[in-house]
Amino acid sequence: MHFTHDMKYLFIAEKPSLMRDVQACYRNHKQEVTERVGEIDFTALSGHVCTNCMPTDYEEWKDKSWKAIVYPMIPNPWQIKPIADRRKQETLAQIKRRAADYDGIIVGTDSDVEGYGIYWLMEQYLGLNEKPALRFIEHSLTDAEI
């Protein structure tokens, strides 16, 4: 996919503090950023919002005792579920509703394995994997670095 300045992105931050810092920088440099990347809107997670399903979440293992299960347990396909927290589920619902209005996503989770996992689980659960995604990698949260 070719990225152009007329595209519209949803920046999904891992935490509200990161969203506020990046959003403030964006406001200070909006014309320059818009000319290079496009328009950006912001939202924030509060860390993990999805998780892999537990064995008891799968129909084939739901009512079986651990002794009755054949190992290894390899679900096919793997399933993902939202974390059982009302605010996190509301955040997921909001992102799902809003995502259709954007050409792509800017992933603002921490640039480590855990941060990637937070986004990947959410992306798979919400079906965002067809949207182009750009990765925001933070080194520090100063205006110059952002």
Predicted regions, residues:
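Intrinsically disordered, low-complexity regulatory segments
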Residues: 1-146
